[in-house]
């Protein structure tokens, strides 16, 4: 995707401005890690390349994945190959769990959420980040998009209580991201011309995002849920 190339030359403040979803995701994982007791067991379900490991250096971090999502990724940091619908762990052994932009890639999301609930200890918490309006990615393993209501339903059915559920941006941040998406259709000499047309409005639009009060047009959601004691 175009973002991998863009991130290499963007200064930090501009990365946060243009690629807001990515920045919010990183903040959410870092902040979540800060709430977990030192030494506690943490499951990263659908960890991919385990790039969030840096935030859990003081925990017993267990990244698992089925390793079929992207054939360009390096899965060597994964501790176990695991089908998220049947996690290879006893019940109630993790203090916390992550499921970061992974739930759209599973055919049985309810079973996955229920498995996360099963392996959490009473009082344990799970951080989920899910897409709402997003392009197809990691095809053909891309099955679902989620509304706030659908996510609440999945969590409720698994016996989890929602503590936090927040949209990541509104209409104008969504449109900014979509303009950047458009750069991928241009090559050679047409690319700088397209960049001149698409990047300036992409820079301006996020400043208008406060106009969207409901945030029904959003890139995705960050959610924290707890297993009852």
Residue ranges and their predicted role:
Residues 101-105:
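Short catalytic micro-motifs in class I SAM-dependent methyltransferases
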Residues 110-111, 115, 119-121, 125-228:
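S-adenosyl-L-methionine-dependent methyltransferase catalytic module, highlighting the catalytic core
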Residues 51-53, 107, 136:
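Glycine/Thr-rich phosphate-binding loops of Rossmann-like dinucleotide-binding domains
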Residues 88-90, 107, 147:
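GHKL-family ATP-binding catalytic core of two-component histidine kinases
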Residues 1-92, 96-100, 113, 218-221, ...:
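Conserved N-terminal segment of class I S-adenosyl-L-methionine
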């Amino acid at each position: 995707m175009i973002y991998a190339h863009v991130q290499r030359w963007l200064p930090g403040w501009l990365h946060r401005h243009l690629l807001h979803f990515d920045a919010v995701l990183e903040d959410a994982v870092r902040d979540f890690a800060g709430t977990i007791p030192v030494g506690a067991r943490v499951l990263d379900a659908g960890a991919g390349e385990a790039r969030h490991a840096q935030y859990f250096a003081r925990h017993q971090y267990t990244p698992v994945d089925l390793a079929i999502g992207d054939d360009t990724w390096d899965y060597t940091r994964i501790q176990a190959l695991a089908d998220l619908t049947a996690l290879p762990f006893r019940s109630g052994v993790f203090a916390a769990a992550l499921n970061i932009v992974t739930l759209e890639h599973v055919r049985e999301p309810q079973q996955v959420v229920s498995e996360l609930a099963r392996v959490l200890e009473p009082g344990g918490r799970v951080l989920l980040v899910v897409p709402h309006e997003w392009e197809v990615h990691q095809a053909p393993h891309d099955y679902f998009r989620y509304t706030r209501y659908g996510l609440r339903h999945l969590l409720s059915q698994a016996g989890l209580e929602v503590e936090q559920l927040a949209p990541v941006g509104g209409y104008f941040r969504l449109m900014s991201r979509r303009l950047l998406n458009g750069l991928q259709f241009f090559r050679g000499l047409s690319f700088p011309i397209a960049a001149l047309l698409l990047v300036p409005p992409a820079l301006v639009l996020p400043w208008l995002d406060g106009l969207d009060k409901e945030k029904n047009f959003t890139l995705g959601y960050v959610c924290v849920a707890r297993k009852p004691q």
